[in-house]
Regions:
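Extended effector regions of multi-domain proteins
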Residues: 109-129, 191-293, 297-439, 445, ...
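Hydrophobic helical h-region of N-terminal Sec-dependent signal peptides
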Residues: 6-12
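Exposed beta-strand-loop-beta-strand "reactive/processing" segments of non-cytosolic proteins
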Residues: 61-111, 157-217, 279-281, 417
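Bacterial Sec-dependent signal peptides at the C-terminal "C-region" and cleavage site
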Residues: 12-35
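Positively charged n-region of N-terminal signal peptides that target proteins for export
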Residues: 1-4
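Charged, low-complexity surface segments at secondary-structure and domain boundaries
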Residues: 33-42, 117-128, 140
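N-terminal pre-domain segments of enzymes
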Residues: 28-57, 234-254
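Short, non-transmembrane alpha-helical segments in secretory-pathway proteins
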Residues: 40-80, 128-172
Length: 679
C-alpha cells in the first residue's frame, strides 16, 4: 500500500479522537491535584478509573469494552454538606459493552463495591476509538471488495480512505439497528498534492469519493454492505484540487506587527485541586469523556459567605442533522456528544488555540480496555480584556469645569476556561466565561470543515448545477456543502441563593391607554411564575418578548425583589417536522428551553444511551409526569445553535461561528457589582 496502516491509524486518531497520547508533560497550572484532597466534584483520578475497570472485569470478564468511565453524579445533599478536609463520597459511572449488550453500572470507590448492573435494550453507548473505530478502519481499507470499488475509479490502494460515522436507527432491511453495533463509512481521496510530496493530503475531507459507502458491523467485525452508486450513472471527479490550507501550502499575507497580552505580575486566579477562584467567583472544574469540561458549585464568594448561582453546568447533547435524501447521505444526523464524546475527542491545545499567557491542565481519560491515559493540555485557563470597558460614563454637564472628574470608565477583565473538541471534520471550542459584573457565559464556537459532497457541476453555469445544489451550496468546483443544523443542548442546574428556586417569565406587553392619555405607546412587565414542567416548555417568539428568570424562593435583595439570574440565548428551533426519523430521536430541540424538577439521574437531554437510540428519549420522558416546579430545586435545559447555509467563504476552513448562553444577575445584587473596580 502507498500508506501503511500506521499512517491510516494516525489519520483516524487525529480525525476522530484527537491523537491521544499516554504521557504527561506540557505547561501545567500551579495545581497539585494529587496533593489536594478530592472533592465530590473532581474528575476521576487514574487510580479511580483503574479500580472501577478492574471491578467491572471481575464481574463481567475480561472481554469488556469500556465506553465511558466517569464521575457518577454524587448525592446532591451529601455533596453540598462536604467540607474541605473531609473524605468525599465518590462513585464512578461505567458504561460498557459485553456479550453484545449495553451495560451501565455504578461503582462505589470508597467501599470497592458494584451496584447491580443495568442492561439497556434501547440505545448504545459512545463509540470507542482504539477499541472500535481505528481497527474497523484498518480492516475496511484493506478489504478486497472495497479496493475493487476504488480501482473502478482508478484509485490506487492507500490513496483512498474510508472514515466511520454513526448510522442512526436506519438499515433495518439489512441489520438489527437496535442491537447490532454499526458504522457507516464514507470515503475520501487523500493522495498528497504539491509540496507535501508522498504524504497524504492534510485536507482529508476535501475530496470525497462520492457514491461509495460501507455499512459495517463492529462486533461481528464484518462488512454488511458496500453501496456503490450515483444517480444517472458515472461519478463526480475525486482527483480535484484539495486546497491545502496549512502554512507552507499556500501564500500567506504579510504578518501583522505583534499584538500581545501579558501577565507581568502573574495571574489573578487560583486553582486548588479542582476548585477555581477569581474575582469573587468560585467553581469546581472537572473533565468528562462525554461532556468535556463540567462546572460544579458555581457562585460568588462574598463577605457574608458563598452565594450559589448553579450547582452544575455542562453540555447535555449535540445534534447535527444534514438535509439530503441521497442514498449516501440520508442517515447523516450526528449526536456528536453522545455518540463520540466531547471529552474523548478533545485535542491538545496549542498554537493559537489559547493566548500565550494561558495556563494548561492535563486530564485523565481511558482506553477501551479501561487503562487510564494522561492526555496533555486539554484545558486552558486565562484572563483577557474583551476590548470594551465594563462600565463608562462621561458627564457632559461638567465639561470644562476645573477640578471635576467628569469622565469615568473601568477596564473589563474576563476569566475563560476553554477546551476544543475535533469531532471528525468540525472543531468546537467550549468556553466558560466569567465577568466581574456577575455575568457568566457558556460559549460554543464552531469552526473546522463542513461535510463535503462530490457533484458533477464545476460552476453554477453547468447543466447539473441546479440539481446538484438542491440541498446545499457549491463552494468549490465539484464540491457541495450540504445544508444542516447545529443544536447544542446544555443542562444548567440552577441554585440561585440555594436550591429552592422558581422559574419566571417576565412578560413585556403593551398597555392600552385611554384615548385622551398623552401617550398611546406604553409597555409594562408582568411576572408569571411557572408551576409545572409541561407549562415551562418555552418556544421563544419575537412578537411576545419575555425575560426568562430563575429566582430564589427564599432570598430577596435590598429592595425586596427575589434574587435571580436571567438566562439569555439565541432563538433557534428546527425548521422540519419532528416526525422525521432523525429528529424524533432529538426531541430536546423542540423547545428553546425546558425546565424540570431536579432528579439526580436526569443528565442527558436525548437520553443516557443515545447511539442508535429509540425515538422520544430524554427530556420528553423527564417531563411526562409534569411535576410541579415551584419553590423547589429546578434544572434549566437551554438549546442554542444555528441553521448552517454554507457559502464560499466557509471554504476550505470555516471562520469561527459564536453562539452563547448568558447567565445575567437580575436583582441578585443591590448595585452594579463592578462599580468598585479601581480606575
Amino acid at each position: 500500500m502507498r500508506y501503511t496502516l500506521a499512517v491510516v491509524g494516525l489519520i483516524v486518531a487525529v480525525a476522530l479522537f484527537g491523537g491521544w497520547e499516554s504521557r504527561g508533560g506540557g505547561s501545567q497550572s500551579s495545581v497539585n491535584a494529587a496533593a489536594a484532597e478530592a472533592s465530590p466534584w473532581d474528575s476521576l483520578s487514574a487510580q479511580e478509573i483503574q479500580s472501577a475497570a478492574t471491578a467491572v472485569k471481575q464481574r463481567h470478564g475480561r472481554g469488556v469494552l469500556f465506553n465511558r468511565i466517569s464521575l457518577a453524579q454524587p448525592d446532591k445533599t451529601t455533596a453540598l454538606q462536604w467540607q474541605s478536609g473531609q473524605q468525599a463520597v465518590r462513585q464512578a459511572a461505567v458504561s460498557f459493552r459485553a456479550d453484545g449488550k449495553t451495560h451501565h453500572v455504578i461503582y462505589d470507590l470508597s467501599t470497592d463495591s458494584l451496584a447491580p448492573t443495568q442492561i439497556f435494550d434501547n440505545g448504545q453507548p459512545m463509540l470507542t476509538g482504539d477499541g472500535e473505530m481505528t481497527p474497523a478502519v484498518a480492516q475496511i481499507n484493506e478489504d478486497p471488495a472495497l479496493l475493487g470499488a476504488l480501482a473502478k475509479r482508478s484509485i490506487e490502494p492507500g490513496d483512498g480512505l474510508c472514515l466511520p460515522r454513526t448510522t442512526g436507527r436506519f438499515f433495518d432491511e439489512l441489520v438489527d439497528p437496535v442491537h447490532d453495533r454499526l458504522l457507516r463509512l464514507d470515503c475520501f481521496y487523500i493522495k498528497g498534492q504539491g509540496g507535501i510530496g508522498i504524504l497524504p493530503s492534510t485536507a482529508a475531507f476535501a475530496r470525497p469519493i462520492e457514491g461509495l459507502s460501507v455499512l459495517y458491523d463492529l462486533e461481528k467485525q464484518a462488512i454488511v454492505e458496500i453501496t456503490d452508486s450515483y444517480p444517472n450513472g458515472g461519478y463526480p471527479p475525486h482527483d480535484i484540487a484539495a486546497l491545502e490550507y496549512h502554512e507552507g501550502a499556500l501564500e500567506t499575507r504579510a504578518p501583522l506587527r505583534p499584538v500581545t497580552a501579558s501577565r507581568p505580575q502573574g495571574v489573578n486566579f487560583t486553582v486548588t485541586g479542582g476548585r477555581v477562584d477569581w474575582q469573587g467567583w468560585q467553581f469546581y472544574l472537572r473533565f468528562d469523556p462525554r461532556q468535556g469540561t463540567v462546572l460544579n458549585r458555581v457562585g460568588h464568594l462574598t463577605p457574608e459567605g458563598f452565594r450559589s448561582v448553579a450547582y452544575e453546568i455542562a453540555m447535555s447533547e449535540m445534534f447535527v442533522p444534514y438535509y439530503d435524501t441521497d442514498a449516501h447521505w440520508f442517515y447523516r444526523a450526528y449526536f456528536d456528544m453522545g455518540e463520540y464524546g466531547l471529552g474523548n475527542t478533545a485535542t491538545e491545545l496549542k498554537g493559537s488555540d489559547c493566548p500565550s499567557h494561558a495556563e494548561f491542565q492535563n486530564v485523565v481519560l481511558h482506553s477501551a480496555d479501561g487503562t487510564p491515559k494522561d492526555v496533555p493540555n486539554r484545558i486552558c485557563i486565562f484572563e483577557h480584556d474583551p476590548g470594551y470597558p465594563i462600565w463608562r460614563h462621561h458627564e457632559s454637564l461638567y465639561d470644562g469645569v476645573p477640578g471635576m472628574e467628569n469622565h469615568q470608565s473601568r477596564s473589563a477583565t474576563e476569566l475563560v476556561v476553554r477546551m476544543v473538541a475535533t469531532i471528525g471534520n468540525y472543531d468546537y471550542f467550549q468556553d466558560y466565561v466569567f465577568a466581574q459584573d456577575g455575568r457568566m457565559r457558556v460559549r460554543l464556537v464552531a469552526t473546522g470543515i463542513d461535510a463535503t459532497k462530490g457533484v458533477m457541476a464545476a460552476s453554477m453555469a453547468d447543466p447539473s448545477a441546479e440539481a446538484d445544489t438542491a440541498t446545499g451550496t457549491l463552494i468549490a468546483p465539484h464540491l457541495v456543502w450540504v445544508n444542516h443544523d447545529h443544536f447544542f443542548g446544555y443542562r444548567i442546574d440552577m441554585d440561585v441563593d440555594g436550591q429552592n428556586n422558581n422559574f419566571q417569565r417576565h412578560k413585556l406587553r403593551a398597555v392600552p391607554q385611554p384615548v385622551d392619555a398623552p401617550r398611546q405607546g406604553i409597555w409594562a412587565v408582568t411576572t408569571e411564575t411557572v408551576t409545572s414542567e409541561l407549562a415551562a416548555q418555552t418556544q421563544m417568539d419575537v412578537s411576545k418578548p419575555a425575560l426568562l428568570v430563575f429566582a430564589s424562593a427564599d432570598q430577596t435583595n435590598a429592595m425586596g425583589y427575589p434574587t435571580g439570574y436571567q438566562i439569555i440565548m439565541p432563538n433557534v428551533r428546527p425548521l422540519v417536522t419532528l416526525e422525521d426519523a432523525t429528529h424524533e430521536r432529538a426531541l430536546f430541540v423542540r423547545n428553546n428551553l425546558w425546565v424540570t424538577r431536579f432528579k439526580r439521574e436526569e443528565l442527558f437531554s436525548a437520553g443516557l444511551m443515545v447511539n442508535q437510540s429509540a425515538p422520544g428519549m430524554g427530556l420528553p420522558q423527564f417531563v411526562a409526569d409534569d411535576e410541579t416546579i415551584t419553590n423547589t430545586d429546578v434544572v434549566a435545559w437551554p438549546t442554542i445553535g444555528f441553521h448552517h447555509v454554507p457559502m464560499a467563504e466557509d471554504w476550505p476552513v470555516m471562520p469561527a461561528k459564536v453562539d452563547e448562553i448568558i447567565l445575567k444577575p437580575r436583582n441578585f445584587f443591590d448595585r452594579n457589582p463592578a462599580i468598585d473596580l479601581p480606575n
